[in-house]
Amino acid sequence: MRQTITDDLDALLAVLPLRVREAIAGMEDRAELLEIVLDLGRLPEGRFPQREVILSDSPISREDLDGVVERIGRFGDDNRAGIGRTLHRISAIRNRRGEVVGLTCRVGRAVRGTVALIRDVVEQGRSILILGRP
């Protein structure tokens, strides 16, 4: 069974502040990246399965957040947005005035070639609950 993983990471990186984008692009293990946290006034952080990495020595500014929000577009009522034709999810944290004060950018990945393991169950047409780590 051959698996391929598609993450379209470049599409997610394209909406990030330049210094954050460059830090991630230069990492050898960027394929393992789980999420990027951009909180106002704090250092940007990349989260990997076994570690967390500071992505810049400059704290996230209002301009950084506004730029990302502008490139992403509209957030839903649940304060989430996506990037077209990808599985990436961006969650916004807002203050009481409704201003975005933080963004968590979750890397979405499609794993192709794995359905063979459960094809017979899927083809039964019944409900299935699949659990896994977030």
Q: Whereabouts are the PLM-identified features?
A:
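Short, ordered loop/turn segments at secondary-structure junctions
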Residues: 41, 133-134
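P-loop NTP-binding catalytic core
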Residues: 56, 67-132
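N-terminal accessory targeting/assembly segments
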Residues: 1-82, 86
